[in-house]
Design a protein with these regions (language model features):
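A short beta-loop-alpha structural element at the N-terminal edge
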Residues: 57-71
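Conserved GNAT-fold acetyl-CoA-binding loop/helix
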Residues: 78-100
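A short helix-loop-beta-strand connector motif used in the catalytic cores of GNAT acetyltransferases and
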Residues: 98-112, 143
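Conserved beta-strand in the GNAT
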Residues: 113, 118-127, 148
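Conserved acetyl-CoA binding element of GNAT-fold acetyltransferases
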Residues: 137-151, 206
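Conserved glycine-rich acetyl-CoA-binding loop
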Residues: 146, 150-164, 171-173, 184-191, ...
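Conserved acetyl-CoA-binding loop of GNAT-fold acetyltransferases
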Residues: 175, 194-203
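Conserved beta-strand-loop-alpha-helix junction that forms the acyl-donor binding cleft
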Residues: 179-189, 206-209
Length: 209
């Protein structure tokens, strides 16, 4: 079986002839690669695509990222406000600039950002550890306090890349699990986390009086 290598974008990468039934997404520290295989005129054409995200990086947040993070926090808050205007105030953020400056240096509450010339996504995390508890087993947990993708970058797998980065980070520091909360009615977020393999741990009940 012969293989023709077709260039799409800036790079041309020779690939071994393998059986590929669909596309695959490959990530390194600087770029996302999409590789497709298609049978054309009885030959296999391997189409190499350089992702739109050419200079992407997921890393710990820095002071310079604060304006972008605040913009994302506004987007998150508006989602929550639309869901529960009886609980959330509009046009505000969970953290202010000074609070973010402190959080950025807190290793127990790491903030990660997805950068592509601008901050396109963030993940606020908290590391907690239970030891010698009367009821609970010893356990180290990474809690995702907030994860957001810029509304202009949604549908481009930014959230998936962020989540997988956080998952790998949690494993690297010896966490036993990852937890987070999803508001009822936020169906898109619930579906996303289920697709990432997460399952319901507990349910918070409410009655409004």
């Amino acid at each position: 079986m012969s293989a023709n290598i077709r260039k799409k974008g800036e790079l041309l990468v020779p690939l071994p002839i393998v059986l590929v039934t669909s596309f695959s997404c490959h990530r390194n520290k600087n770029q996302l690669l999409l590789i497709f295989a298609a049978k054309v005129r009885n030959n296999w054409d391997f189409l190499y695509f350089r992702s739109k995200f050419v200079n992407t990086m997921i890393r710990r947040a820095e002071i310079k990222d604060i304006p972008g993070i605040i913009e994302l926090l506004h987007q998150v808050n508006m989602v929550h406000y639309v869901l529960r205007p009886d609980l959330f105030k509009p046009y505000t953020t969970k953290y202010k600039e000074q609070e973010l400056e402190t959080l950025i240096d807190d290793d127990s509450k790491p903030i990660f950002v997805f950068e592509d010339g601008a901050v396109l996504g963030h993940a606020f995390c908290m590391i907690t550890e239970v030891k010698d508890d009367k009821l609970l087993q010893d356990i180290k947990t990474l809690y995702i306090d907030d994860i957001c993708v810029d509304e202009k970058a949604r549908g481009k797998h930014v959230g998936k890349a962020l989540y997988e980065y956080v998952r790998d980070y949690a494993q690297s520091i010896g966490c036993n699990n990852i937890t987070l909360n999803v508001w009822d009615g936020n169906d898109a977020a619930l579906s996303f986390y289920k697709n990432m393999g997460m399952k319901v741990q507990k349910t918070t009940m409410e009655i409004v009086l």
